[in-house]
Amino acid sequence: ERREGRPISPDRGPEILAKTKKNAQGKDMLDNGNEIIKTANHFVIINGDKPEKALMAMKSTQLKVSRGWNSLMQDQFETDPKTSKALPAPMFSRVYKLQSVENSGSFTWHGYKVSLAKKVDNASLYQMAKEFHNSLKQSNATATTEESNY
């Protein structure tokens, strides 16, 4: 197989990871020598002059940041005005600030720092985020029912 540094196939999840073994550097390798890179994807809206939808792929040292971000999102609650009970807030109902930070160990690299900025306070931005969320949910449901090309 060619080693061009690009994905060979879109295999995902525990099925492909179950076929790997850790090499001396701790990387997940298949028997054929291909590396499987664990990647966490976050669909986001970049809140600039004109909001833009984007995909943030986090791998390697940023997987810990991704897990922390997921925990931060899961720790957000809203109070139901009728019952006064705390309910999980939709992930798209918050604005998060992402900063670039320098990390160091045996070498130096830059990564992300994620913090909660505020609740979404712009109705059109909230609606855009909600529609984006719903379209992704629908796409995921469709993708799981289709048969693979591989």
Language-model features: locations:
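OB-fold ssDNA-binding interfaces and closely related basic DNA-contact patches used
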Residues: 1-52, 105, 111, 119-121, ...
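Glycine- and charge-rich intrinsically disordered segments
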Residues: 123-150
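Extended serine/threonine-enriched, polar tracts that run as long, contiguous segments within proteins
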Residues: 38-117
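Low-complexity, intrinsically disordered regions enriched in charged/polar residues
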Residues: 10-11, 23, 59, 63-67, ...
